[in-house]
A protein has these predicted regions:
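Short Gly/Ser/Thr- and Asp/Glu-enriched loop/turn motifs at secondary-structure junctions
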Residues: 36-40
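General small-molecule cofactor/ligand-binding pocket signal
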Residues: 32-34
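Local sequence-structure signature of Cys/Sec-based thiol-disulfide redox active-site neighborhoods
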Residues: 1-25
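Non-catalytic, surface beta->alpha helical segment in thiol-disulfide oxidoreductase systems
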Residues: 49-70
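A short, hydrophobic beta-strand/beta-hairpin element that forms part of a small beta-sheet core
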Residues: 41-49
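PLD/PLD-like phosphodiesterase catalytic module centered on the HKD motif
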Residues: 29
Length: 70
């Protein structure tokens, strides 16, 4: 399973926290982190957008959204 997290510089710690939580839940997950200058926090499962906003939501909510799609 491939998850990509695209985040603005101010949200880097949130992205790394989400990556850690996903790796704890799914041992086979590959997580790519991509920083951007835009104000954006987006999570993609394979090529589909799971979450996208200009602010962060909690990790459990994003993990729930991913679980709905797998």
């Amino acid at each position: 399973m491939l998850v990509t997290i695209i985040y603005s510089e101010s949200m880097e710690s949130n992205a790394k926290s989400l990556r850690a939580d996903m790796k704890a839940k799914w041992s086979d997950v590959n997580v790519n982190l991509m920083g951007t200058r835009r104000t954006l926090y987006q999570v993609q499962l394979e090529s589909k957008v799971v979450y996208s906003a200009d602010s962060v939501t909690d990790n459990n909510s994003i993990i729930d959204l991913i679980e709905e799609r797998i």
